[in-house]
């Protein structure tokens, strides 16, 4: 079943952010056809890579009230207590942070972890070290979002650029209501996504575990 899920995901339509790259590859391939040049193969390979990289499969969030889901596909590379990004104004009290590394083979669409309202979005320029390193959370270019949930608590999701990824896209604004599993952005070509849980919550996952964005439950809100 997992194999068929992977095949179905790889055939998913591309995210709109990938269209310029896909069109560029197709134009290069057509130009290669016109001039009888090896450019056709380069264009086709680039197009196929972009179709795979920007794939955007549908996801079904769990029907469990209070379930906090993974904001991205990938592998958990770090877990621990850490203060959320200061630009969000959530205080300096450490809370559980779950860091997910997205390789170039993972789906790169970011999804909302829980129902709520976006209260703050803050972009910070920075470095571009490998997103698999722990220092990427504090050193790299990032886009941080604070989301207030029904209980009044706030969680944070941080889109982090990587060594190759140099473009972070976010499709929501401050004040927008959001739903669990809803698409809200994408990071191009390898990246990291951090999730800061509300105060007092502990993750239900483990370091090294593979996440499915919008579906894997990372934690549950207290009743």
Each language-model region and where it sits:
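Contiguous, well-folded functional domains in the mature portion of proteins
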Residues: 1-223
